[in-house]
Amino acid sequence: MKKTISISLFIIIACTLAGTASEDVAKEKQYVSVNVPNADIKIQYKYSLLEDRVIELNRTGLNKIFSFSRIYKNFSWKYTDFPSGRLDGLTTVQTFDTDIIGPIMVSAESNEDGDDPIAEFTGGWHGFNGNQSGSPTARHVSLQVWVDGKMVNDTFKGYTNDLVIETTSNIQGFNTKKKDGSGREIIQQKVKMKFNEGRADVHIKMVPLEKVRIHTYYGLQTALSQLYANSSIRYESGDSQEWKDTSSGPNDSGPKGKYPNVYRMTAKNKHNDEVVVWLDTKYGLGKRLNVSDKYPSAFFVGYKSYFNLINGIPLIISTGQSAEVHG
């Protein structure tokens, strides 16, 4: 059986299986555990006849920003097309110890007062040292959750049709960050995720807190490690419809000047599990107006795949404006 994990800028979809269920429960094909005070959310969905998958989100990394943290599997004892509703006996199949909700390379246009103004990413998992070390460069601000249209202020466990998560964080610029972590926050990141039957539509809105220059930005990223190590990858509307082997090193979709509308990346492991990543290329940063023609529209390097959204043509925005992406 072919199993699919699909990511719209990070979307996860389970295959639909035949089965019997009560009329009420059959309409609710995901089971969720929400703990707002502890910023911990688990979303269970049907993956195969005998297996459920669970997406976990919590505050991760050096900056403790709310994001994807793990994917688990557990045995499903219900021969139906909805998950078991059991969250015990989980086995980790993927740990996200890297950026999924991506960092940003951004600088303040005035009042540069940072301790190390070298162009580097901030936010995500990136600390003052430019990697996963040093003082934090971002701060978690808020988390709000709705289950079937009703806000959850405390905890919730049960089957749902729709789960909406909104999280906000503030990010320092590379020319305003400080060794002691007190750097000036210059841009706010708002992320809205809508989950339905294991699928998440993601909208990211970057709101400047002052006039800023965004040098490089990829939006959401995928980690092709562990479960998806040594996958093959294909770029829709890229230079080739052939599968490219990630174990052979970096690859890409071809230059944006020739292939500007790459809207989907599909990675497949040897067991035919797939990760499908798509981008709305008619909306906001997805139009790639701030990507130089020489850079690829999408690419794979190391163990991660990316869409190029800002690269080579900096975007300058001021308060009252925003930069947005949807997938």
Please state what every model-predicted region is.
Residues 107-196, 211-213:
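Extended, loop-rich substrate-binding clefts of extracytoplasmic carbohydrate-active enzymes
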Residues 162-166, 199-201, 320-326:
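Intrinsic-disorder/low-complexity, polar/charged segments enriched in Ser/Thr/Lys/Arg/Asp/Glu/Gln
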Residues 222-223, 230-302:
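Active-site/ligand-binding surface loops and adjacent short beta/alpha elements
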Residues 1-4:
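Positively charged n-region of N-terminal signal peptides that target proteins for export
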Residues 25-63, 69-71, 266-327:
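Beta-strand-rich recognition/accessory modules
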Residues 8-16:
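Bacterial N-terminal signal peptides
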Residues 23-133:
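Beta-strand-rich N-terminal accessory domains
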Residues 187, 198-240:
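Acidic (Asp/Glu-rich), glycine- and aromatic
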